[in-house]
C-alpha cells in the first residue's frame, strides 16, 4: 500500500512564473489580451481563407490546419495558466495534468509535421510550377494533413503513457507554467534515463525528421531560385516562401533548444520562458507573419474590409 501511495498522485501544484501577487496580476492582464488576440487572429485567418475563393489552394489549406493547431495549443495551456494567476491554491488534478501534457505534445508534434508538409508544398510551387495543381491535388493534401494529425497524436499518447507510469513519490510540485514533459519527468523518484532516452528518440523522429525534410525542401527551393534569370522572378519566388521560412525558424529553433539535449539543455527558467513563447507568442505571431508578408492574404483582407464597409454604408442609409 505504501508503494501505491507513492506511485499515484491525486494532484500537482504548478509553481508558475512568479509568486508575487502584483506580478501575477500584470501577467494575467498581458496573457489574457494576448490569448484573445491569438484566438481572434487565427479564427479570422481561417474565416478569410474560407470566404475568399482565391485562397482555396493547398498552401492555404495547410495554413488553415496550422491556425487550428495554434488556437488549440494556446487553449490547452493559457486558460489554466490564467486561472492559476488568480487562484491561491494553484493545483491541477492528475487527470487534467495528463490531458494537458497529451494535447500540448500532440499539437506541438502536429505543427512540426505540418511545417514540413508546407515546405514540400512550397518546393513544388517553386520548382515544378506547371505541374503544381496536378501534384498537390486535394486527395494528397488531405492525406498529408491527416498524417500530420495522426503522427503527432500517436507520439503524444505514447509519451504521456510512459511519463505518467513513473512513480512520483510525495513530490507534487511542478516548477513550470504547465504540465510540460521534462518538468513532469523530473518529479519521478526513480532513474529516468530511459524516459529521457525515449524523449530523445521521439524528438529525433518527430522533430528532426521533419526539420531535415524542411532543410531538404529549402535547399532545392534555393537551387531553383538561383537558376531564375530575372531579379523580379527571384524576388517573387523568395516571397512565396518567406512567411513559412520565418515561422519554421521560430518554431523549430525554440523546440530543438529545449528537447534535443535534456541533460545539458536549458535551465528551468529558460524552459518556462520558452514555453511562454511557444504557447502565447508563437500562436499570435503566425497569423501576423502570414498576413504581413503575403500579398494574397493582404489582398483578401482588403477585399473583405471593402465588402464590410460597403455593407455598413448600406445599413447606415
UniProtKB/Swiss-Prot annotation:
Localization annotation: Cell membrane
Gene3D superfamilies: Rhodopsin 7-helix transmembrane proteins (1.20.1070.10)
An annotated Gene Ontology molecular function: G protein-coupled receptor activity
Extracellular side: 1-25, 80-100, 159-195, 260-272
Keyword check for ATP-binding: no
Positions of glycan attachment: 5
Residue spans crossing the bilayer: 26-49, 58-79, 101-120, 140-158, 196-219, 237-259, 273-292
Record-linked PROSITE patterns: G_PROTEIN_RECEP_F1_1, G_PROTEIN_RECEP_F1_2
SUPFAM superfamilies: Family A G protein-coupled receptor-like
Cytoplasmic side: 50-57, 121-139, 220-236, 293-317
This protein's GO CC annotations: plasma membrane
Keywords recorded for this protein, A-Z: Cell membrane, Disulfide bond, G-protein coupled receptor, Glycoprotein, Membrane, Olfaction, Receptor, Sensory transduction, Transducer, Transmembrane, Transmembrane helix
Any Pfam family hit: 7tm_4
Keyword Iron included in the entry's annotation: no
Record membrane topology: Multi-pass membrane protein
Highest taxon of the lineage: Eukaryota
Record-annotated disulphide pairs: 97-189
Gene Ontology terms describing biological process: detection of chemical stimulus involved in sensory perception of smell
Function description: Odorant receptor.
Family in the record: Belongs to the G-protein coupled receptor 1 family.
Entry protein name: Olfactory receptor 2F2
Organism: Homo sapiens
Gene that this polypeptide is encoded by: OR2F2
Amino acid at each position: 500500500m505504501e508503494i501505491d501511495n507513492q506511485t499515484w498522485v491525486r494532484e500537482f501544484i504548478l509553481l508558475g512564473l512568479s509568486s508575487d501577487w502584483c506580478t501575477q496580476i500584470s501577467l494575467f492582464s498581458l496573457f489574457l489580451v494576448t490569448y484573445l488576440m491569438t484566438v481572434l487572429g487565427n479564427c479570422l485567418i481561417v474565416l478569410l481563407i474560407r470566404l475568399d475563393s482565391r485562397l482555396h489552394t493547398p498552401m492555404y489549406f495547410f495554413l488553415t490546419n496550422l491556425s487550428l493547431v495554434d488556437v488549440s495549443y494556446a487553449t490547452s495551456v493559457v486558460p489554466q495558466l490564467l486561472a492559476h494567476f488568480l487562484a491561491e491554491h494553484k493545483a491541477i488534478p492528475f487527470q487534467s495534468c495528463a490531458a494537458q501534457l497529451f494535447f500540448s505534445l500532440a499539437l506541438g508534434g502536429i505543427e512540426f509535421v505540418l511545417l514540413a508538409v508546407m515546405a514540400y508544398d512550397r518546393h513544388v510551387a517553386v520548382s515544378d510550377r506547371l505541374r503544381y495543381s496536378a501534384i498537390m491535388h486535394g486527395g494528397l493534401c488531405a492525406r498529408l494533413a491527416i498524417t500530420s494529425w495522426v503522427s503527432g497524436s500517436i507520439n503524444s499518447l505514447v509519451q504521456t503513457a510512459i511519463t505518467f507510469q513513473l512513480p512520483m513519490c510525495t513530490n507534487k510540485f511542478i516548477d513550470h507554467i504547465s504540465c510540460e514533459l521534462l518538468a513532469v519527468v523530473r518529479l519521478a523518484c526513480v532513474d529516468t534515463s530511459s524516459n529521457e532516452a525515449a524523449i530523445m528518440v521521439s524528438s529525433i523522429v518527430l522533430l528532426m525528421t521533419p526539420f531535415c525534410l524542411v532543410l531538404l525542401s529549402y535547399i532545392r527551393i534555393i537551387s531553383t531560385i538561383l537558376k531564375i534569370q530575372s531579379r523580379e522572378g527571384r524576388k517573387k519566388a523568395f516571397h512565396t516562401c518567406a512567411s513559412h521560412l520565418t515561422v519554421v525558424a521560430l518554431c523549430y529553433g525554440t523546440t530543438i533548444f529545449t528537447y534535443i539535449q535534456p541533460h545539458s539543455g536549458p535551465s528551468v527558467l529558460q524552459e518556462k520562458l520558452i514555453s511562454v513563447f511557444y504557447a502565447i507568442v508563437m500562436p499570435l505571431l503566425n497569423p501576423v507573419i502570414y498576413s504581413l508578408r503575403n500579398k494574397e492574404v493582404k489582398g483578401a483582407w482588403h477585399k473583405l474590409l471593402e465588402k464590410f464597409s460597403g455593407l455598413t454604408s448600406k445599413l447606415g442609409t
